[in-house]
Design a protein with these regions (language model features):
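Histidine-acidic metal/acid-base catalytic patches
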Residues: 43, 96-118, 122-215
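A short acidic, amphipathic alpha-helical/loop segment
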Residues: 6-7, 34-35, 132-136
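Aromatic- and glycine-enriched glycan-recognition loops and surfaces
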Residues: 3-5, 65, 168-169
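Flexible loop residues that form catalytic
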Residues: 1, 26, 52, 149, ...
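Active-site acidic/histidine proton-transfer and metal-coordination neighborhood
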Residues: 13, 17, 21, 25-116, ...
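Glycine-rich, proline-tolerant flexible connector loops at the mouths of alpha/beta enzymes
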Residues: 1-11
Length: 215
């Protein structure tokens, strides 16, 4: 389903809030007003730039060009009452002049116009520490994508339900909360289980953490 009106109706029927979206990269950069209109229909404040796609990030200069485009789009979204964030994968941890691509993009944009939607799995896959990145993004982390990092006995790396892998969730949740995170979003690309069982496992784990924190 792509029609935002249909998506909104389905969400309203079951009492779901649409907390954030991923829109096509070219739509965000080339047609940001259309993105604002779509988010208005969805009743949603946040969207994230999902992937560089055809936009080059193969040099420091290319990263700075992309950063400029993102800031320009972010200004338009902000004028429309929306917030643009950047969603990372592992490729954003390639380094130029000792700075990762993600650092280059975020340090060369105004945080009002571009925030971060960190993905815990991909930060780890990129060789970085999700806890440290949550700490670094204080005041700039409205959205956090949560999936665990599972390494099998055969050294295969898998997406995991939150709490089933090797990530330090107590520290991640603490640092993200202190950073001002508004939405903790479970996003598991694939699962070895039924999808509904998978999401329930992650939800139950996070609720247990929340209850323990509030005691």
């Amino acid at each position: 389903v792509q029609d935002p009106k249909v998506i909104r109706e389905l969400a309203d029927e079951v009492g779901l809030i649409i907390c954030a979206t991923h829109e096509p990269s070219h739509k965000i950069l080339e047609e940001p007003l259309e993105v604002v209109e779509r988010l208005n229909i969805l009743g949603c404040k946040h969207t994230a730039f999902p992937h560089p796609g055809s936009y080059a990030i193969d040099s420091m200069e290319a990263c700075l060009v992309l950063a400029n485009k993102l800031e320009s789009a972010g200004k338009i979204l902000r004028d429309g009452g929306k917030q643009l964030s950047y969603h990372n994968h592992e490729l954003e941890f390639v380094r130029y002049a000792n700075k990762s691509i993600l650092e280059l993009i975020l340090t060369n944009t105004d945080s009002k116009f571009l925030q971060a939607e960190l993905d815990t799995f991909w930060v780890q896959k990129g060789g970085e520490d999700p806890v440290e990145w949550c700490r670094k993004m204080k005041g700039r982390l409205p959205l956090l994508h949560l999936k665990d990092y599972v390494v099998t006995l055969e050294r295969e790396i898998l997406f995991g339900e939150v709490g089933t892998g090797s990530l330090n969730w107590d520290a991640i949740i603490r640092e993200a909360d202190e950073a001002g995170c508004e939405w903790f979003i479970v996003e598991q690309d694939t699962s070895t289980r039924d999808s509904f069982e998978s999401i329930k496992m992650s939800f139950d784990f996070l609720m247990q953490k929340a209850e323990a924190q509030n005691q």
